[in-house]
């Protein structure tokens, strides 16, 4: 028993040594290969340069070149000094005029930065990428600063570990190299040095054969366990095993992944269901900023099932032409039956959205079929969280039983098809391609029974053919809930009075500081009211248009009904420190004249980007400053303060470095995030601090995002430098800003 325990203890240690030894060998081999590649490339480039030089020399020999006359004297030029250049060789002396350059004041120091026009969210840096150079004076005053800085990153510094770098190529080579060892080699430490050298030579002789031939069997688990122990940041042993499988699987050229849907515009387009066609769209598209893979919202809101009224989807009762489907017998009755079925169907809230993923061993049918599994909503967006547990699964099963229709996007399948009145004329036998069928299923969830509009969008089918295809697919397309079911009541004046009072109550709870404002995340609690457990209510935020709650939610912000400029506290939006929403505020002009600068609403400047022209020049106070080109009026929007959006913890780590540089561009956005314009930002970052500023900053809610706006505190003339209050403490103000600009005497 004693020997067995000793051997089991020595096994992992031995494998760790092997991992380190093979890793160092592979790294050294990679460096040698890289050096050989550099030498080969250098020789090749050198040869090309020599060949090109020889070609140019031959061309110059054939050309006639006019000789240059050497100036021997400049005495004829008055007020100039001469400078002669002589040589010990047989070259004549050269005399040229000497011109003196006057001293020029140097420009202020500026660190490199990347220009941005909107905020950019970044992840926290848990590893110190480089140790900043502070100068000898800073280190002499505070010798422990570097040590404390490294402690803030838990001692993780980029490049300080000998075995810190491993990419996919080295990982595969390392696993293959470790696979040469036998399972009986765990007690190599007890062997003689001569025997160990012989084994090492045998391994080196077999490495060439190993590289040419693929491994016969999958590597043992102990190999991945040893690699995981040496590189814990690369994942567990199971994760490394899956990664090795993915990297070593041989893929055929041009083969698509098992979960990939062919391009709808390509020759291999297939007829697939709506959720499969829109899976990438729902996964990558951000519904808050209307971009793919946006860099501002890590959480993508799920599509709101409460549909707005849209004139594009309104059904036109007039036929589009003599061949319109409405001339067919039974067409109008069929459309009326669809509308009646939609009105009968109440809107159901989905039980929760998760990122849909198809199993590897299954594929969706090319033709629609009725299936209980397909009624599950798979075209999900990025999830806010993952629910686990038996209780949650029971709830999901109960919700699945209740759900017969998914949402307004018609992602589910209905088992009660609508019967069509038989037509006198037989339907046309038209073949639909996979792309056309998939496009029809995508559009039917938006345009419903507006077959003329769907035909115009498809482009290759008439509205009659679209209508007949819709009748054919009636058994698998669910009736969509009508948009009139959730229409709010018409008593808007009383509702807005209550909301104005509600806004004042919320505003009284906040003192205007960004430290008491929390970041907004859309709430998503199906069939649950927005009570004390709602995340929006907990954070004292209003429910926005991105939330999944009902439009009758008591915490939902309704917008304003102003007919003025929305620049006083009489406007609910202005009172709540938020810009007017063009989707909610329909009477103040926020939704009108989007391309025009003459907008009646003055509370939508940040979202429109109505910034002023700013000029960058040396400041009269310190370093660089920003100046206004055109005059602005009091309370007029000047620019948005843009930069990287980082967490409060990351801001604390960066701030300690910025304090030593005595230069900081950190700006509190809310209680969760900070805007840092040090590395990325716009020109307003150069606005200096003043206790008597001509601008002020205000954090506003703009379409669900907190953004920082810089406004004029008074009327500013052309060419004035912009200042705003950094809200320094008295000690910090004396420490960082020792110069105050001179006040102009009127």
From Swiss-Prot:
Domain of life: Eukaryota
Region of interest called Disordered, as start-end residue ranges on this chain: 180-217, 340-426
InterPro entries reported in the protein's UniProt record: CXC_dom, EZH1/2-like, EZH1/2_MCSS, EZH1/EZH2, EZH2_SET, PRC2_HTH_1, Pre-SET_CXC, SANT/Myb
Modification comment: Phosphorylated by AKT1. Phosphorylation by AKT1 reduces methyltransferase activity. Phosphorylation at Thr-345 by CDK1 and CDK2 promotes maintenance of H3K27me3 levels at EZH2-target loci, thus leading to epigenetic gene silencing. Sumoylated.
Chain positions covered by the region annotation Interaction with CDYL: 329-522
UniProt note on tissues of expression: Present in actively dividing cells. Widely expressed in early embryos. In later embryogenesis, expression restricted to central and peripheral nervous system, liver and thymus. In adult, highest expression in spleen, testis and placenta. Lower levels in intestine, muscle and ovary and very low levels in brain and liver. No expression in heart, thyroid gland, lung and kidney.
Domain CXC, residue spans: 503-605
Ranges of compositional bias, category Basic residues: 345-357
Bias-annotated ranges (Basic and acidic residues): 196-217, 374-385
Modified residues (Phosphoserine): 21, 76, 363, 366
Keywords for this protein: Biological rhythms, Chromatin regulator, Chromosome, Glycoprotein, Isopeptide bond, Methyltransferase, Nucleus, Phosphoprotein, Repressor, S-adenosyl-L-methionine, Transcription, Transcription regulation, Transferase, Ubl conjugation
Family as reported in the entry's similarity comment: Belongs to the class V-like SAM-binding methyltransferase superfamily. Histone-lysine methyltransferase family. EZ subfamily.
Job of this protein: Polycomb group (PcG) protein. Catalytic subunit of the PRC2/EED-EZH2 complex, which methylates (H3K9me) and 'Lys-27' (H3K27me) of histone H3, leading to transcriptional repression of the affected target gene. Able to mono-, di- and trimethylate 'Lys-27' of histone H3 to form H3K27me1, H3K27me2 and H3K27me3, respectively. Displays a preference for substrates with less methylation, loses activity when progressively more methyl groups are incorporated into H3K27, H3K27me0 > H3K27me1 > H3K27me2.
Subunit text: Component of the PRC2/EED-EZH2 complex, which includes EED, EZH2, SUZ12, RBBP4 and RBBP7 and possibly AEBP2. The minimum components required for methyltransferase activity of the PRC2/EED-EZH2 complex are EED, EZH2 and SUZ12. The PRC2 complex may also interact with DNMT1, DNMT3A, DNMT3B and PHF1 via the EZH2 subunit and with SIRT1 via the SUZ12 subunit. Interacts with HDAC1 and HDAC2. Binds ATRX via the SET domain. Interacts with PRAME. Interacts with CDYL. Interacts with EED. Interacts with BMAL1. Interacts with CLOCK and CRY1. Interacts with DNMT3L; the interaction is direct.
Name by which UniProt lists this protein: Histone-lysine N-methyltransferase EZH2
């Amino acid at each position: 028993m004693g020997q067995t325990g000793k051997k089991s203890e020595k096994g992992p240690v031995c494998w760790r040594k092997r991992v380190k030894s093979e890793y160092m060998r592979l790294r050294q081999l990679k460096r040698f290969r890289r050096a050989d590649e550099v030498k080969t490339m250098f020789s090749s480039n050198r040869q090309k340069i020599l060949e090109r030089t020889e070609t140019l020399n031959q061309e110059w020999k054939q050309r006639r070149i006019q000789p240059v006359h050497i100036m021997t004297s400049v005495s004829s030029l008055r007020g100039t000094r001469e400078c002669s250049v002589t040589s010990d060789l047989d070259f004549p002396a050269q005399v040229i005029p000497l011109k003196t350059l006057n001293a020029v004041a140097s420009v202020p120091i500026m660190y490199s930065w990347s220009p941005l026009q909107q905020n950019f969210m970044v992840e926290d840096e848990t590893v110190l990428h480089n140790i900043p150079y502070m100068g000898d004076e800073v280190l002499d005053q505070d010798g422990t600063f570097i040590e404390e800085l490294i402690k803030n990153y838990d001692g993780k510094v980029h490049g300080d570990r000998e075995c810190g770098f491993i990419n996919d190529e080295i990982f595969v080579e390392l696993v293959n190299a470790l696979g040469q060892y036998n399972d009986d080699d765990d007690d190599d430490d007890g062997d003689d040095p001569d025997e160990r050298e012989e084994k090492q030579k045998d391994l080196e002789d077999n490495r060439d054969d190993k590289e040419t031939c693929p491994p016969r069997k999958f590597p043992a688990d102990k190999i991945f366990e040893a690699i995981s122990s040496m590189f814990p940041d690369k994942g567990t042993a199971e994760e490394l095993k899956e990664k090795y499988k993915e990297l070593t699987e041989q893929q055929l050229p041009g083969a698509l992944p098992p979960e990939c849907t062919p391009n709808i515009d390509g020759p291999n387009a297939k007829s697939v269901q709506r959720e499969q066609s829109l899976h990438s769209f729902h996964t990558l598209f951000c519904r808050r900023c209307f971009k793919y893979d946006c860099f501002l919202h890590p959480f993508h809101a799920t599509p709101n099932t409460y549909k707005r009224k849209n004139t594009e989807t309104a059904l036109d009762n007039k036929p589009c032409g003599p061949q319109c489907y409405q001339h067919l017998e039974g067409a109008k009755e069929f459309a009326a039956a669809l509308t009646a079925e939609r009105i009968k169907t109440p809107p159901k809230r989905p039980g929760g959205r998760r990122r849909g993923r198809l199993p590897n061993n299954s594929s969706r049918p090319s033709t629609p079929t009725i299936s209980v599994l397909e009624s599950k909503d798979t075209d999900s967006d990025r999830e806010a969280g993952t629910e686990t547990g038996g209780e949650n699964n029971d709830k999901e099963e109960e919700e699945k039983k209740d759900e017969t229709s998914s949402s307004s996007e018609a992602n589910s399948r209905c088992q009660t098809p609508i019967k069509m009145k038989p037509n006198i004329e037989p339907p046309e036998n038209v073949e639909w391609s996979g792309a056309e069928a998939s496009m029809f299923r995508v559009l039917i969830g938006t345009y419903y029974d507006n077959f003329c509009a769907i035909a115009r969008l498809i482009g290759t089918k008439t509205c009659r053919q679209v209508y007949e295809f819709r009748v054919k697919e009636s058994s698998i397309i669910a009736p969509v809930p009508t948009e009139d079911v959730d229409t709010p009541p018409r008593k808007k004046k009383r509702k807005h009075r209550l909301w104005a009072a509600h806004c004042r109550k919320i505003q009284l709870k906040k003192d205007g500081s960004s430290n008491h404002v929390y970041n907004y995340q859309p709430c998503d609690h199906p069939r649950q009211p927005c009570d004390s457990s709602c995340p929006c209510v907990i954070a004292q935020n209003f429910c926005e248009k991105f939330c999944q709650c009902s439009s009758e939610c008591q915490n939902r912000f309704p917008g304003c009904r102003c007919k003025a400029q929305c620049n006083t506290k009489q406007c609910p939006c202005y009172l709540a420190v938020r810009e007017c929403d063009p989707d909610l505020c329909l009477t103040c002009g926020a939704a009108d004249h989007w391309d025009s600068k003459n907008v009646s609403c003055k509370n939508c400047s940040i979202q429109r980007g109505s910034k002023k022209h700013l000029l960058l020049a040396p400041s009269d106070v310190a370093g660089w400053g920003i100046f206004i080109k055109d005059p602005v009026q009091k309370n007029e929007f000047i620019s948005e303060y843009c930069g990287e959006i980082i967490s409060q913890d990351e801001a604390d780590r960066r701030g300690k470095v910025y304090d030593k540089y005595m230069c900081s561009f950190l700006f509190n956005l809310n209680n969760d995030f900070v805007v840092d314009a040090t590395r990325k930002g716009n020109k307003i970052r150069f606005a200096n601090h003043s206790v008597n500023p001509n601008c002020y900053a205000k954090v506003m809610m703009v379409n669900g995002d907190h953004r920082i706006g810089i406004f004029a505190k008074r009327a500013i003339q052309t060419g004035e430098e912009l200042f705003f209050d950094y809200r320094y403490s008295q000690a910090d103000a004396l420490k960082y800003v020792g110069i105050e600009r001179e006040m102009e005497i009127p």
